[in-house]
From Swiss-Prot:
Pfam families: TRAFD1-XIAF1_ZnF. The keyword Secreted does not apply. Keywords: Acetylation, Metal-binding, Phosphoprotein, Zinc, Zinc-finger. The keyword Zinc-finger applies. This is TRAF-type zinc finger domain-containing protein 1. A zinc finger (TRAF-type) spans 27-103. Residues 197-236, 392-580 are annotated as: Disordered. Residues 453-463 have a biased composition (Low complexity). The modification N-acetylalanine is found at residue 2. It comes from Bos taurus (Bovine). GO terms for biological process: negative regulation of innate immune response.
Amino acid sequence: MAEFLNDQDTRLCDNCKKEIPVFNFTIHEIHCQRNIGVCPVCKEPFPKCDMETHMATEHCQVTCKCNKKLEKRQLKKHEETECPLRLALCQHCDLELSVLKLKDHEDYCGARTELCGTCGRNVLVKDLKTHPEVCGRDVEEKRVEAAMPPNAYDESWGPDRIWIASQLRQIEALDPPMRLPRRPLRAFESDLFQSRTTNQRSMTAQFPIQNNLLEEQERQERNRSRQTPKERGEDSANLDFMLALSLQNEGQAPTLAEQDFWRVIYEADQSREGPSALNDIRGAVDETMLPCEFCEELYPEELLIDHQTSCNPSCALPPLSVGSTSPRGVEDPDAIFQKLMRESAGGQFESLMGFSSSAPVEDSVVIPCEFCGVQLEEEVLFHHQDQCDQRPATANNHVSEGIPSQDLQPRETSPELPKRRVRHQGDLSSGYMNDLKQEMAKGPTYPLPSSRPPNNTTAPPNRLSTSTSGPRPGCQPSPPRALKLNNLDSQGVRGHSRNSHNGALAPGHVPAAYPARSLYPENLVPSFPRGPSGRYGASSRSEGGRNPRVTPTAASYRSRTAKAKTPKQQGAGDAEEEEE
C-alpha cells in the first residue's frame, strides 16, 4: 500500500499551488477554492477567514527607530543586520554603542596607551594584540642610543650646524640635474636634530625658522637608526671643517661663494687620499679664531680679512648675474661637482661629507629665491626667504628708496586762473586810480571848490563836473557824460534837476553845452538806456513822463546837448581820450 501511495501520480492545484494526488484532486480542488485564499502581497495560501488578520499583522507599514518605513514582517531582520542605530560592542573596551558612533569611538579608544608588563613601554591599545610579537626588540636600540651622549659634539658649534643644514640645501639646489641625494642630507639632519640639547631649544630669537621646523622633523627622524660612535666622531670633525669654510664666504656674492666652496671641497677631497688627511681636517678646527669687527663672529685667522671685506656694511654687494663666468684660474663649479660625483664611487665623497650610500634623486619643484637668486625646493623656499641675508629691511624698502620724497620734488603749480568777477555799474576799474593820480599831478583841469575833494559829490549843484577848457584843435568837443552815483546822491540830483526845469531861466543866460569829463572809468555803463539818436533821448522821455511840468525850454536844452556830437565824432573823442 505504501508503494502504491509513493508511485501514484500528483497534480498541481491552481489555487494553493500544491501537489495533490490525482485520485483526491477533485475533492481537494472543491474544498480549496471554497475555504483557502492566496495573499495578494506575499502570494502565500491562507484560510479566507484569517486573511484580514494576516494582512494586519504581517503586511502593515511600521517605522523603525532610524525613521525607515518597512513591513512588519521585515522589521526584525532590519534591526539585526541593517539598521544604523543598532547596538554594537567596541573591540577595545566592550562598550555598547550605535554603529554610527562606533568607528569614531574605536579610533579614540584605540589611541590610549597601556603599560606593557614585559618591556615596560607604553603601547597603544589598538596595538596590544600585535605587540607581543615585537615586545623587547626596542630595548637594544635604547642601549645603543644611551651609549652616545646627546652632547658628544662641541656645544659651541651646535647652532652653526643648523646653519650648515640650510646651506647644504642651497648647495643641493645649485645644479638641479646634479644635486646631492636626498637620503644623505636627511640622515645628516636626523643626526643634527636628534642631538640638540635643552639650551639649543631656547635659541628662538637667533634661529626662529629652524626652531619652527625642529619639532616636526624630530618626530619624523626619532625612530631612525643612528651611526656608530666612530663614524659620528669623523662626521663631527668634517662638519666643523665645513662650517669654517662656509663662514668664510658668508657675505660674498652667491656666485663667488659657490666657486670658493666647491674649490675647497675639491682640495679637501684630494687631500684625503693621503694618510694624514683626517689630521689636517681636525687641525683646521684647532686654528686661532678671531672675532669680526662688524658681526662679532669668530673666524679663522687667515680668513678674517676676506670676511671683513665682505661683511663691511659700507661695501655694497655686487649685482647678481645669471650668466657670469668663473674667474681665471678657477675651474667651473659644474666640472668640479661632476668630478666629485665620479670619484664618489670609491666612498671618498661620502666619507668627507659624512654620508652613506644613497638612493636616486627624487623629483621635486625647484624655485629661485627672489632676493639672492639661489634655487631651492618648494617646501624650503618660504623659510629661506624669511631669513635671507639679502632680504631688505622692509618689504617695500627698495621701492621707496628709488622714489624721491614728496618734499624734495619741485611742486608743479599752475597759475591760478583769474576768477571772473561780475562788475557792477558803480564799480571802479583797477587802473582808474592810477590814471586819476597822474592827471591830478599835471594840474587841476576841473573847476572844483577847494573845500571838497575831487571824488566827493555831496553838494547837489556840483554833481556834474564840467570842463572849462576849450575844445582842442582838430577835435570836436565831446558830449557831456553821465555819472553813476549812489542812491542818495542820485535822488538829490533828480530833485535838483526838477527844480531847475520848473523855474524860469535867468534873463540873459544862454544855455550852453559844456563837455564833461567823467571821474569814473570809460567802461562805465550808464544806468539809463541809450537811444540811437542821442545819449539822453530816452532819459528826456522818462523825465518827461515822471514830471509832466517840464517846460519846452528845458526839453529844447536837452535835445541840443544830445545833438552836440554825432556817433562818429563820439567814437573819435573816446579814442583820443584813451591815447592820453
